[in-house]
Amino acid sequence: MDRLFEPLNFRHGPAMKNRFMLAPLTNLQSHDDGVLSDQEFKWLTMRASGGFGLVMTCAAHVQAAGQGFPGQLGIFDDVHVGGLARLAAAIRHHGSLAMVQLHHAGLRSPPDLIGGHPLSASDDEKTGARAVSYT
């Protein structure tokens, strides 16, 4: 039990101040365009100030067509950089490490949410998903 409060060293990068990590939670707090909201910023930085050694965001979609749920954090456009940089700095200010969970909902992206058919690793007749290709 005492080891929970000891630093955790990694081969590369900074050490965690302790072994407590905030798991990525689905909190539905971001703006419709994926920009971090003030509410989500406050919620996550409160976890850092509360003593977590690492604070991880919710699943952040890496492509607009990969959004899985309303209020999901985005990390696919320059418009997201300011909020994410501000969040990382605030988390580090409290001595915690900041981490983003990367996510793409694939064929589970709701068509009404993404405004079209979902993208997937391969075509799927049942859902109308089409394979991602970059030709």
Located regions from the model:
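Aromatic-lined carbohydrate-binding/catalytic grooves of carbohydrate-active enzymes
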Residues: 52-77
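Glycine-rich, aromatic-flanked loop segments that form ligand/cofactor-binding clefts
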Residues: 47-59, 83-132
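Short, glycine/charged-enriched secondary-structure capping and boundary segments
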Residues: 35-37, 70-71, 113-116
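N-terminal amphipathic alpha-helix/helix-capping segment at the start of soluble metabolic enzymes
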Residues: 1-24
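A structural motif
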Residues: 18-24, 45, 98-102
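Glycine-rich anion/phosphate-binding loops
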Residues: 31-46, 73-92
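Conserved small/polar residues in nucleotide/adenosyl-binding loops
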Residues: 135
